[in-house]
From Swiss-Prot:
InterPro entries: PSI_PsaJ (IPR002615), PSI_PsaJ_sf (IPR036062). The keyword Thylakoid applies. The chain crosses the membrane at residues 7-27. The gene is psaJ. This is Photosystem I reaction center subunit IX.
Amino acid sequence: MADFTKFLTTAPVAFILFSSFVFALFIEINRFFPDILTF
């Protein structure tokens, strides 16, 4: 179990979680405010 918790705290897992959160936030912003570059 210690190895599993050590794996969850590594940098790639944190990067995957953070990047998936940022991409989901960007997709939701584009869903509610489409074509934001035309403003």
